Amino acid sequence: IENAHPGMFRVVSQRQTDLKQLVCDPTQLALWGMSPADTAQHVASEISPAQRASSISINYFAQQLLDVSKMSSAIELSGVYESVDLDGNPILLSGKVILPAKEPIKRYILVSHYTIASNAEAPSNIFSLEGLLVKLGYALIIPDYLGYGITADQVHPYLVMDITARNVLDMYDAVVPFMKAAGCVPEHDDIYLMGYSQGGATTMAVQHL
């Protein structure tokens, strides 16, 4: 985007991902704690109400998203945005935006990721399971957090909620004007917050900012 505001999200790399091909990749499924059998099971038959009631889990959530018959394509935008470090000094952080390739965007989901063990698992470096929500019309905003992505050389402030929440919200504030300038405006103004484990704590902290 020409003449982008300095505070906007800046794209470093972009690619289009075939979701159907992605969920049929055993290596990718393993990263999500899944297997090809999970995909085959969902495609073979609808999950019964009884299963639905007894399977409220991450795997059930994944099975709902792994219906390959309804998969389309997603656009992945990895980029950087301005935030602050632990001392309040300006810093560039990284993250990823995942949006439907062709369908209109319903609304944003701001995702705070769970605890990860290495930079290889940072959202900028993988396709997060939550990204499959694009098939339902959502655009995902997923920060790497300080200490991951382009700041992997720094110590991650694990469970220092105020700074992590600030970093997460700063990415949202940077992405929204970027998307508007690109002509990608959601149908609804309200956003969903999403997080699991460390991401759950971060999501609650974001609500207090």
Positions of PLM-derived features:
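Secondary-structure boundary elements
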Residues: 102, 137, 173-185
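Catalytic-loop region of hydrolases
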Residues: 1-104
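Alpha/beta-hydrolase active-site loop
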Residues: 158-181, 208
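Gly/Ala-rich beta-loop-alpha elbow adjacent to hydrolase catalytic centers
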Residues: 195-199, 203
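Stable alpha-helical elements in mature extracytoplasmic
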Residues: 108, 129, 164-171, 202-206
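Second-shell loop/turn segments in exported
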Residues: 129, 153-161
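Residue in the alpha/beta-hydrolase core beta-strand immediately N-terminal to the catalytic nucleophile
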Residues: 190-192
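Short, surface-exposed "cap/lid" segments of acyl-processing enzymes
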Residues: 85-137, 144, 148-151
